[in-house]
A protein has these predicted regions:
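Active-site core of metal-dependent hydrolases
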Residues: 177-290, 298-299
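Active-site gating loops and adjacent loop-to-helix segments of metal-dependent hydrolytic enzymes
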Residues: 67, 71-74, 79-94, 143-164, ...
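Histidine-rich, glycine-flanked metal-binding segment
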Residues: 1-3, 9-53
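Divalent metal-coordination and catalytic microenvironments
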Residues: 8, 21, 26, 49, ...
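C-terminal cap of metal-dependent C-N hydrolases
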Residues: 8, 25-28, 347-388
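His/Asp/Glu-enriched, well-ordered alpha-helical/loop segment
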Residues: 271-358
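Divalent metal-dependent hydrolysis catalytic cores, especially in the metallo-beta-lactamase
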Residues: 79-104, 110-132, 147-161, 183-197, ...
Length: 388
């Protein structure tokens, strides 16, 4: 199948100007000022007045559903294909959260494969909040080495009343296993860390880094914008060389209580001197957004949305004045590099043909291509999930 996108203003994510993009099968075959070809079945798309950016990577999504903190009826539903594609997301990383009992690794991997059959790319992390880590094979290393979809471990919870209260030694052993498994499989072997509201912040990771040979970039902490004091701790952590991830799914009450809006968080991090390559956004899609009282009792619940991922990036551009090339990196090139997804995150020859076309006038999503296939056109789903 041949697709030719003509006259797009391309952000690779770096701005490279007006280009034609030729897609053959599932990859980008050429990017030139002008491509003029004829071939049977050639699909030509006029992207005049549109911006082409890499397909978005959402590396923290509860594809199986999450939640459950308010008992069984609060378990959230599985992700549907268009929950991702209508938001421009072409690559996902599935995680298990609080509930590592009824949400299992076999089910997580099966769901990832189902999403891939429907047209997008999906990886997973092994484990959940819990320590010891519940893996598929019995060992973190073995999951990474033997299971193609597994690229890291997590989300391991720290600084949270819902965590297993892991020690620095336990976290070090998890990171070591993930690192070795990653080395032997050619994967990132990253440890995705859920950071809660506790004033312990990122100290557990910092102790591991200070007392072992494990590098700070083995860890990928998320929810760093959840409150002002964690955000400030995140700035100091990032200045030591660590990655920081901001969660885009939110509700007004969280913002009123001090959560730092992602667009604002990005601007403040950059102003503080943190390199943009260390910063990512993820949606925490399909997670419950629980509100607890002072006694740790659940008093409210809403659902995280993958659609919020690009909405936050768009706000960073339109509301905070951040350059599109910098803003779009946090959901494209940065996660691709952190997770060692070498065929993702950039519009470049040889990369997977994951491309989003934006309206130049307002940065809204017009079209989405995943592995060369049109998933969204004119902001309408072209391909839907099996049960949608």
């Amino acid at each position: 199948m041949l697709t030719l996108i003509k006259n797009a203003d391309v952000y690779s994510p770096d701005h490279i100007g007006l280009k034609d993009i030729l897609i053959t099968d599932k990859r980008i075959a050429a990017i030139e000022d002008h491509i003029d070809i004829t071939a049977p079945g050639l699909h030509v798309i006029d992207a005049n007045g549109k911006i082409a950016v890499p397909g978005f990577i959402d590396s923290h999504v509860h594809i199986l559903g999450g939640g459950g903190e308010g008992s069984y009826r609060t378990r959230t539903p599985e992700l549907q294909l268009t929950d991702a594609t209508l938001g421009g997301v072409t690559t996902l990383v599935g995680v298990i959260g609080t509930d590592g009992t009824t949400r299992t690794m076999p089910a997580l991997i099966a769901k990832a494969r189902a999403l891939e059959e429907e047209g997008i790319t999906c990886y997973v992390h092994t484990g959940s909040y819990q320590v010891p880590v519940k893996t598929l094979t019995g060992k973190i290393e073995d999951d990474l080495i033997l299971i193609d979809r597994v690229i890291g471990a997590g989300e391991i919870a720290i600084s949270d009343h819902r965590s297993s209260q892991p020690t620095a030694q336990e976290l070090a052993k998890i990171a070591s296993a993930a690192r070795i498994g990653g080395m032997l499989s050619g994967k990132a072997g990253i440890v995705n860390i859920h950071v809660g509201d506790s004033h312990d912040h990122l100290s557990l990771i910092e102790v591991v880094v200070e007392t072992t040979d494990i590098p700070i970039k083995q860890f990928y902490p998320t929810h760093i914008n959840r409150n002002p004091h964690l955000f400030e701790a995140g700035i100091h952590y990032a200045k030591k060389g660590g990655y920081v991830d901001f969660t885009t799914s939110s509700i007004p009450k969280f913002l009123e209580e001090g959560e730092v809006k992602c667009s604002v968080a990005l601007k403040r991090m950059l102003e503080a001197g943190v390199d943009v390559s260390q910063i990512t956004f993820t949606s925490d899609g399909q997670a419950s957004l629980p509100d607890f009282n002072a006694d740790g009792e659940l008093i409210g619940l809403q659902l995280g949305k993958v659609m919020s991922l690009y909405e936050a990036v768009r706000e960073a551009v339109t509301d905070e004045g951040i350059d599109l090339a910098a803003a779009i990196r946090v959901i494209t090139k940065n996660p691709a590099q952190i997770l060692k997804l070498s065929s993702k995150g950039e519009i470049a020859v040889g990369k997977d043909a994951d491309i989003v076309l934006l309206q130049q006038s307002d940065f809204s999503i017009d079209s989405v291509f995943a592995m060369g296939q049109v998933m969204v056109g004119n902001n309408q789903a072209v391909i839907k999930g099996t049960f949608e």
